[in-house]
């Protein structure tokens, strides 16, 4: 190419510039010295043109390289902008959700009042307005939480003139073997610049009735003859011997009336609106069945849940410590009080759809007592789930799915997937993968105050499916997200002895945990 470039310049010089250097033939003479000078000038010009050609070649190559780099930088900038826009969108949705939860909590707390009145003033105050939970210190220095709510009958047309006031109670936290009152009143102390914490695991929660319970709700396991026989006997005993008002499910009321017309005193509900007001009526909830019956009973209450007394009449029960054969003695002791209870935390979950038409359009909030499961369903592809904890990236799940479990659900699906068994009163969220395609993917236990977001990325090969305590199955498309956090309303279940004793006994009896023949003492 350079030779062609020289040739072109030579032709141009011969056709134009050379003529200007030679003498005009019309003058009649030719000077040899002038011709030699002309040839020398041509050689000098050729020498000057050669480095110019090389410089032009380098400039062309450099400009092409700059265009290539600019194109690559432009593509990277566009990709980064898209990623930042997507992250900003999820952050905005999360902040809107969090602010909404904070507003709801402030509204709930604003309805509460401190319990500083005397007993006479307290009853007068209860007649005027309901009070939620207020913390106080009892006369013996024990930390308590009182719950007083006035029963309002306006929501039930069929329940008028049935009941005027709901029973009140208080909860007490007691430390074993701790004589120092400081550990009874404070979780964290910082006296004299020294930080100390009380041992929360040693605290057993007790429920003491301040007024007699008046209303009991009984939830039964369906399609069981033994449960039906026991429910008939229990309803009759609670009514005739204890004078309590009885609520049952519509199905159970029909069964009781078919048994005898004398059960016409039993009350029930007709629609979801009446169910939503049950917590203002019911003082105690009794379940006859297994853990599934407890889950069903808890799912009926989208807010506060009355204390539950679970009787074991199922195949396996980690939350049902009471035996049905001694139900009268058990209920006598519970109605009299005080009783030890286990506070079982729940998760509140909702789905945010990518195709939502408004800025913030979540679906109905679901409450789970055991776990929420995200799996691949019938798809032959692995699930691809991006997981975040308070907007911090956790990991990308590639496997059969993921389990977000409460500590009460640690002995259920999470245990089968390799998760640890955790005491139900330990507040936390279990993060357990289902058959992950990674040897290093081990389960996690996250603190109770975090918010976990699981979303299906846009490049996922398939959708995912989510279920809440094994029901209400929903599909998650690409771009959809599931947001889970700890619910403000726990489920309190009565203990036969105390919380830790019941938990250890349940894993020994239900799972035969660490059951092995004892090694003989006369070994080799």
From Swiss-Prot:
The induction annotation reads: By gamma radiation, hydrogen peroxide and infection by P.syringae.
Q: Please write the reaction equations for the catalytic activity of this protein.
A: NAD(+) + ATP = ADP + NADP(+) + H(+); NADH + ATP = ADP + NADPH + H(+)
EC class name = transferase
**Cystine connections:** none
Q: Tell whether Nucleotide-binding is among the UniProt keywords.
A: yes
**Tissues expressed in:** Ubiquitous.
- Segments carrying the region annotation (Disordered) are 1-25
Q: Which GO terms describe its biological process?
A: NAD metabolic process; NADP biosynthetic process
Q: What is this protein called?
A: NAD(H) kinase 1
């Amino acid at each position: 190419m350079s030779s062609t470039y020289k040739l072109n310049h030579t032709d141009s010089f011969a056709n134009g510039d050379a003529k200007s250097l030679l003498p005009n033939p019309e003058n009649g003479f030719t000077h040899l010295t002038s011709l030699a000078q002309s040839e020398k000038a041509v050689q000098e010009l050729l020498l000057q043109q050669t480095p110019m050609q090389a410089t032009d070649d380098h400039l062309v190559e450099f400009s092409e390289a700059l265009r290539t780099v600019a194109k690559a930088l432009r593509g990277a900038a566009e990709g980064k902008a898209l990623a930042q826009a997507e992250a900003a969108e999820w952050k905005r949705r999360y902040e809107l959700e969090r602010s909404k939860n904070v507003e709801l909590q402030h509204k709930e707390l604003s309805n509460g009042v401190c319990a500083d009145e005397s007993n006479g003033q307290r009853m007068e105050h209860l007649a005027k307005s309901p009070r939620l939970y207020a913390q106080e210190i009892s006369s013996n220095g024990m930390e308590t939480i009182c719950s007083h709510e006035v029963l309002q009958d306006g929501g039930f047309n069929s329940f008028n003139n049935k009941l005027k006031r709901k029973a009140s109670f208080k909860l007490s936290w007691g430390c074993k073997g701790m004589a120092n009152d400081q550990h009874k009143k404070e979780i964290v102390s910082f006296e004299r610049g020294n930080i100390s914490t009380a041992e929360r695991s040693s605290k057993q929660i007790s429920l003491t009735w301040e007024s007699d319970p008046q209303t009991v709700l009984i939830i039964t396991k369906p399609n069981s003859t033994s449960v039906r026989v026991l429910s008939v006997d229990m309803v009759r005993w609670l009514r005739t011997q204890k004078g309590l008002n009885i609520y049952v499910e519509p199905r159970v009321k029909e069964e009781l009336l078919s048994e005898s017309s004398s059960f016409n005193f039993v009350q029930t509900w007709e629609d979801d609106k009446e169910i939503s007001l049950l917590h203002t009526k019911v003082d105690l909830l009794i379940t006859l069945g297994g853990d599934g019956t407890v889950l069903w009973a808890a799912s009926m209450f989208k807010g506060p849940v009355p204390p539950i007394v679970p009787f074991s009449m199922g195949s396996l029960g980690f939350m049902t410590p009471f035996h049905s054969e001694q139900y009268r003695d058990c209920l006598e002791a519970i109605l009299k009080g005080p009783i030890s209870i286990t506070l079982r935390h729940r998760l509140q979950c909702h789905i945010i759809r990518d195709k939502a038409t408004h800025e913030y359009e979540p679906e109905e909030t679901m409450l789970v007592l055991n776990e929420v499961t995200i799996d691949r369903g019938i798809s032959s592809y692995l699930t691809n789930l991006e997981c975040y904890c308070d907007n911090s990236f956790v990991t990308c799940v590639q496997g059969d799915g993921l389990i977000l479990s409460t500590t009460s659900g640690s002995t259920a699906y999470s245990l089968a997937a390799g998760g640890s068994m955790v005491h139900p009163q330990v507040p936390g969220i279990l993060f357990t993968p289902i058959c992950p395609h990674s040897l290093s993917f081990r389960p996690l236990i996250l603190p109770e105050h975090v918010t976990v977001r699981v979303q299906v990325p846009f490049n996922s090969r398939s959708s995912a499916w989510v279920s809440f305590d094994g029901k209400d199955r929903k599909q998650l498309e690409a771009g959809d997200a599931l947001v889970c956090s700890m619910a403000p309303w726990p489920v309190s279940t009565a203990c036969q002895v105390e919380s830790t004793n019941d938990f250890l006994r349940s894993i020994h009896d239900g799972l035969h945990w660490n059951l092995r023949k004892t090694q003989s003492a006369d070994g080799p």
